[in-house]
């Protein structure tokens, strides 16, 4: 019961975050659809450079080792370590705001990837793609978990994570593989 004496549609889980106890609305599914779309775009941004190695090497004077560092280390290092920091912020703060900031960071970094003039600028741009994308999954799963009851949250989380595979497939198509 809430302060008004009416039954509350939200209850706190053991982490203190509210958990949904109501039937799902169309808006809840709209949120999942938007997170799915963001997941697709995020994964395209993440992997498409791997499919464009030859055109990038033709444009920029990069060695195989530098291409490997740009497509692997640059993204992964900040994705992994940033994910820990950003995940903690998401648990303590406003998930939608943090997700929005992460999307802006990785979108700007993706644009910077396209205008990079050499190894250093490309490496830095890919690092920022990694730090931006590090917040996507923790924020999205938290947002979905708040909107759906514990007994029904599996389907929307599965839909969200399916976006990774759809994005990977689209990256292959867009990258010409």
Question: What do these predicted ranges mean?
Answer:
Residues 2-38, 42-44:
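Cytosolic juxtamembrane N-terminal segment immediately preceding the first transmembrane helix
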Residues 47, 75-84, 134, 168-169:
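Residue-level signature of mid-helix packing/kink "hotspots" within the transmembrane helices
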Residues 50-81:
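Extracellular/periplasmic helix-loop-helix junction of adjacent transmembrane segments
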Residues 53, 167-176:
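Small-residue (Gly/Pro/Ala) motifs that create kinks and tight helix-helix packing interfaces
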Residues 61, 94, 115-121, 132, ...:
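Helix-breaking motifs and short loop linkers at transmembrane-helix boundaries and internal kinks
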Residues 125-164:
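Cytoplasmic helix-loop-helix junction between adjacent transmembrane helices
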């Amino acid at each position: 019961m809430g302060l008004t004496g009416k039954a509350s549609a939200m209850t706190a889980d053991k982490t203190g975050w509210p958990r949904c106890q109501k039937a799902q609305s169309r808006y809840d599914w709209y949120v999942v659809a938007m997170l799915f779309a963001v997941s697709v775009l995020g994964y395209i941004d993440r992997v498409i450079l791997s499919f464009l190695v030859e055109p990038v090497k033709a444009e920029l004077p990069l060695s195989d080792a530098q291409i490997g560092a740009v497509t692997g280390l640059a993204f992964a290092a900040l994705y992994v370590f940033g994910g820990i920091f950003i995940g903690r912020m998401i648990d303590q703060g406003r998930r939608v705001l943090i997700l929005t900031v992460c999307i802006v960071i990785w979108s700007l970094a993706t644009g910077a990837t396209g205008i990079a003039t050499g190894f250093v600028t490309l490496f830095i741009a890919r690092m920022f793609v990694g730090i931006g994308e590090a917040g996507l999954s923790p924020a999205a799963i938290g947002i979905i978990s708040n909107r759906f009851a514990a007994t029904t949250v599996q389907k929307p989380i599965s839909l969200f994570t399916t976006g990774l595979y759809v994005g990977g497939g689209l990256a292959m198509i867009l990258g010409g593989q």
